[in-house]
Amino acid sequence: MIAPDLTMDIPTELGRVHFVGIGGSGMSGIARLFLAAGHRVTGSDSRDSDAVQALRELGAEIHVGHDAAHVGDADALVVTGALWQDNPEYVLAKERGLPILHRSQALAWLISGQRLVAVAGAHGKTTSTGMIVTALLEAGRDPSFVNGGVIGGIGVSSAPGSEELFVVEADESDGSFLLYDTAVALITNVDADHLDHYGSHEAFDDAFVRFASAASELVVISSDDPGARRVTARIEGRVVTFGEDPAADIRITDIVTDGPVAFTLTHDGVSRRAALRVPGRHNAINAAGAYAVLVGLGVDPDDAIAGLAGFSGTSRRFELHAEVRGVSVYDDYAHHPTEVRAALEAARTVVGEGRIIAVHQPHLYSRTQMMAGDFARVYEELADHTIVLDVFGAREDPIPGVTGALVSERFADASHVDYLPDWQQAADRAAEIARDGDFIVTLSCGDVYRIIPQVIGALERPAGSAQPAASSRPRE
C-alpha cells in the first residue's frame, strides 16, 4: 500500500483534481465538495455504484477501472491509504511529480479558514457526525459537512453550506486527523485500534492528545472510556466530558433500550429527557457527545435535544435492507469487537423473541490475528448463530495462516458457528437457519454488504428448491 506524504506543501491553486477510488464513502463525499467549489473533478473506481452515478450527475468525469490515461491533465491526485503502489494512475502521477494528496489533505486544503468541528474516535464517528449535522439543520443552521456515511433524512454524506462552519468525520486510522485546523474536537472514545499504523497503544494515545491539544475552542470527550480518560488527563484548555460517569459534565442516566433509545441528559444542574429514532445504548452515548458539541456551538439546549430526535441513522449503521418471509436483513459497519457488541446489543433490543444470525466478515489480517478470540467471545455471547466469511484484507497483504477460521475456531461451542468462505454457501446457510421474526445481520467495514442480494435470494427461494451453483463473493 502507498503512504502519502502528509507533510507536503500543496499548491495554492488546483484546477482539475483526479480521485483514485472515487466511489468510496469518504472519497465520494470529498469529491462532491470539490465540485461544489467549482473544481473540475475526474476519477476512477473499480466498479460502478450509486455514489459514482451521483457524482457523474453533478459533472464529474469518472472511469470504471484504472488506467494511466485517466490521469490526463490533472493538477493533483487524491488517494487513500488503501491504494496499491502498482496502481497505474498512481505510478504515472508519481513519475510526473504531481502532488499526490491523501483524502484528508485534500479536504483540509479545501476547507482552510472555516470554523471546523472534527469528530474522531475508534467507534461512533459516523453516527455522531450525522447527529450533529442533523441537529444543526433542525436548529436552522447551515453548516458544510462531510461524513463517512449517508445521513438519513438528508440523503447525502456531504454538502456545502452557507455558514463558515464545517463538520467533518476525522479519520484517526492513519494519523491524517492531525491535518485539520480544528476549533471544536469531539472524541467519542480512544479504544486502541489501527495498531498496524501506530505500533503501540502509547502512540495511539499520543495521537489523540495531539488532536485534542490542537483544538482552539473546545474539546468534548468521553468520561466513560478508559483511553479517553487517559487523554483528558494530558490536555489543557476548555474540556467538556460526557457519559454515564457521575463526574461527567454532561451525564447520561435512565437509559431505556426497549426499541428506540430514550435517556436523560443532565447539564449544569438541569435534566432533560431525550429520545432517539435509533436503537442501542451506544447511541445514547453518541447523542450525549453530539449534544455537548451543539451547545458549545451556541445551539439552545432544548433545540439540541429536539434536533437529535430527528436523527434517523446513517448508511451501513444497523441499516435495514429487506424483510423476506418475516426475516429482517440488516447491515452494520462494525469491524472491531467493541462495535460488534454495540451493534448486536442494539439488535437484541428490537428483535423481540426472534433470533440474531450474524454474518461476520473479518477486516484486516492483522486485526483478525490479534482479536480473533475477542470477536468469538462477543459473537458467541450476543448472536444465536454466527457465519464467518474469509478476511477482507483491504490495505494489507495476507498473513500466512490467518483466515476467518481463526475466529470460528475460538468459539467454545462449535455448533453456534460456521466458517463458510464461499459466499453463496454462507447466504444459503443463513437462510436455512432463519425463521419468522429473526434478524440476519451482516457486520464488517469491508464489502460484506454485497452478500445481501444473495441472502435475499436464498430467503425468497421455496424450501427444497434447487440452489444456484456456489460462488465466491460477487466479482468487480
Swiss-Prot record:
Gene Ontology BP, a term: peptidoglycan biosynthetic process
Pathway field: Cell wall biogenesis; peptidoglycan biosynthesis
Keywords on record: ATP-binding, Cell cycle, Cell division, Cell shape, Cell wall biogenesis/degradation, Cytoplasm, Ligase, Nucleotide-binding, Peptidoglycan synthesis
Residues annotated as binding ATP: 121-127
Main localisation: cytoplasm
Superkingdom as given in the UniProt entry: Bacteria
PANTHER family in the cross-refs: UDP-N-ACETYLMURAMATE--L-ALANINE LIGASE (PTHR43445:SF3), UDP-N-ACETYLMURAMATE--L-ALANINE LIGASE-RELATED (PTHR43445)
Name of the protein this chain belongs to: UDP-N-acetylmuramate--L-alanine ligase
Gene name per UniProt: murC
